[in-house]
Regions:
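DE-rich acidic low-complexity regions and acidic surface loops
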Residues: 1-301
Length: 301
């Protein structure tokens, strides 16, 4: 039976729904980012061009707008999507006005605390955006408009689309992909072929979601709730992503150790993380920058 495992890490909290050692679903909550579900006391700082409030040192957009208040007014908000990271205005956190009292966000998941053994495999999928399955592979790319899933393989189109539908539904859960998702299947000429692929998606995707039927060109669009960045979006900030992964590996050491990585990754390990890592391993941790290493090539010894 699948069980949630919650891993309290340095820089992030990780949660995974695991069955027989396989991660079925994963979530990440970054340290220092206000999570979805939190209710905050906020200040309205702008009504144009976007309704913007400020709370807990961060700015949030209110897509539904707000009426009856002017700039400088105080109001309660509920965070509906965490900030995605990045300087673009649309990547700020999203919120809505509420009458509820300030309260923390609910837990990332309800489960036992422990170590997620298959986490490194999941990170590799997030790094590359490539998910392999029998007969082909998915290439997944986040864009400003949607996350695009392209299907490639060597099976006949109908069989490839069926296998890809299962793999895409699995990847959407594993990589925590929400919001608008486009899947570009092979062209399917028959209605029955398209119906079979639709049924696979409907059967494997967890609710709630909305989905268009697959059109004659093999394209389907899915819309799921989006509470936080997907693992793919987190991987776009590569230095920070690799820094968190490396600190996680280093945390398994006992006593003094040396962490060697690309200079950008070393620079992304802030002082607070470094000190906590030393306390966790029970010894001095030396950070060593090596420009010859790839961003994902860091090691601990």
């Amino acid at each position: 039976m699948p069980e949630w495992i919650v891993e309290e890490g340095i820089g992030e909290v990780r949660a995974a729904l695991v069955e027989d050692g396989e991660v079925l679903e994963a979530r990440v909550r970054r340290e220092g980012v206000v999570p979805a579900g939190a209710v905050l006391d906020a200040k309205l700082v702008a009504v144009a061009p976007r309704v913007t409030v400020e709370a807990d040192g961060a700015q949030f957009l209110l897509p539904r707008g707000v009426s009856g208040v002017t700039e400088g007014a105080r109001l309660a908000i509920e965070v509906t999507r965490e900030a995605l990271g990045g300087s673009e205005p649309w990547k700020r956190g999203l919120a809505r006005r509420t009458e509820a009292a300030p309260a923390p966000a609910p837990p990332l998941a309800e489960g036992a605390k422990g170590t997620i053994e298959a986490w490194d495999e999941l990170l590799e999928e997030a790094r590359t955006g490539i998910v392999r399955f029998e007969g082909g592979e998915l290439r997944i790319q986040p864009t400003a408009a949607m996350t695009v899933i392209d299907v490639d393989g060597w099976l006949i189109p109908a069989k490839l689309a069926q296998m890809a539908a299962w793999a895409a539904a699995r990847a959407i859960r594993r990589l925590d992909i929400g919001g608008s998702i486009g899947i570009d299947f092979p062209t399917l000429h028959g209605k029955e072929e398209r119906r079979e692929v639709d049924e696979i998606l409907n059967g494997y995707l967890p609710h709630p979601f909305e989905k268009t039927a697959i059109n004659g060109f093999g394209f389907a669009q899915i819309v799921r709730p989006k509470l936080r960045p997907s693992l793919l979006e987190l991987a776009e900030n590569r230095a920070r992503f690799e820094a968190r992964a490396l600190v996680r590996r280093a945390g398994r050491s006992i006593g003094g150790t040396t962490v060697t990585a690309h200079p950008a990754v070393i620079a992304a390990i802030d002082e607070g993380w470094h000190k906590r890592l030393e306390r966790q391993v029970g010894g001095a941790v030396t950070l060593s920058a090596d420009p010859s290493l790839a961003m994902s090539g860091g090691h601990v010894h």
